[in-house]
A protein has these predicted regions:
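A glycine- and charged-residue-rich anion-binding loop/surface
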Residues: 1-276
Length: 276
């Protein structure tokens, strides 16, 4: 993504996406209704939206680390079924037949964040698909690859860490530390045997944590309780509510019986009269 300028520096329009086709051709997708601003045969200057690209780059590299973390925590039978990377978040679909437990989500996050903190260097190389797979790279099932493919690797000599090696043509960080931080927001079912994780990285993690802190502060004020007493306070409120609910139900039954006993001619008609 980025912007298009005239040769004299005047802004022309925005680029919403860029795709590489047939190996060497780059297609720039313009925002809606902006195609008419481009004139055939005219030279333009293209400018990358650096901040947005960096966020996309961070999220893209994070999907590779997430993929390997899932395989390490859940088992090597886990495989990628799809993904979506934007400047706001990442989405990763994978094969697994049940919901992730809180413990599994915690372990997956911890492993990805540990790899981020160690600032592992990214390396890339060109190879044939067969060479890449024979050397341990992961390829997407059913994906069509050119004769030569780009292999992205995040490696470490420590066997307890992630070793990510995948066929990929996208933009990536030079080292994992640039991702900053990683946080899983949700785990949900997409279809039978396929689950979806949505997650955020870097600055978005910081925003997410700050929002949670502010929410906790508001709850502390409402409950008039310290942070370590919030859970206990809510449990006590639930107990009081259930007692009140049971007491109210008993009072209603008692009142009905009292009315009937005092005047046997009174009865309760629950039918609804239709308007004439």
């Amino acid at each position: 993504s980025g912007k298009i300028f005239s040769e004299d520096g005047q802004f022309v329009c925005n680029i919403s996406d860029t795709k590489k086709v047939e190996g060497e051709i780059y297609l720039h997708q313009l925002e809606k209704n902006e195609q008419k601003k481009i004139t055939k045969g005219t030279k333009y200057v293209l400018s990358i939206d650096k901040e947005r690209r960096e966020k996309i780059r961070n999220n893209h590299s994070a999907t590779h680390l997430l993929h390997q973390s899932l395989r390490k925590i859940l088992g090597e039978h886990v495989s990628q079924k799809g993904s979506l990377v934007s400047d706001q978040k990442l989405r990763f679909d994978f094969t697994y037949n049940k919901s992730l437990t809180n413990k599994q989500i915690y372990e997956i996050e911890m492993l990805v964040n540990k790899t981020i903190r160690l600032n592992l260097i990214q390396t890339e190389e060109l190879a044939t698909v067969r060479e890449a797979i024979e050397n341990g790279a992961i390829a997407l099932f059913g994906e069509k690859y050119p004769e030569k493919v780009r292999v992205i690797t995040f490696n470490s000599d420590d066997n307890n860490l992630l070793v990510s090696k995948e066929l990929c043509g996208g933009t990536h960080v030079n080292a994992t530390g640039q991702i900053g931080a990683f946080k899983i927001l949700s785990d949900s079912s997409v279809s039978s045997g396929v689950r979806r994780i949505e997650a955020i990285t870097g600055e978005e993690v910081e925003k997410h944590i700050n929002q949670k802190i502010l929410l906790i502060e508001d709850i502390k004020i409402l409950l008039k309780a310290s942070e370590n007493k919030i859970k206990e306070r809510i449990q006590n409120i639930q107990i009081d509510y259930n007692k009140l609910k049971k007491g109210s139900a008993k009072k209603i039954i008692f009142s009905e019986n009292e009315i009937i006993n005092n005047d046997p001619q009174i009865y309760f008609d629950n039918t609804i009269n239709e308007p004439s």
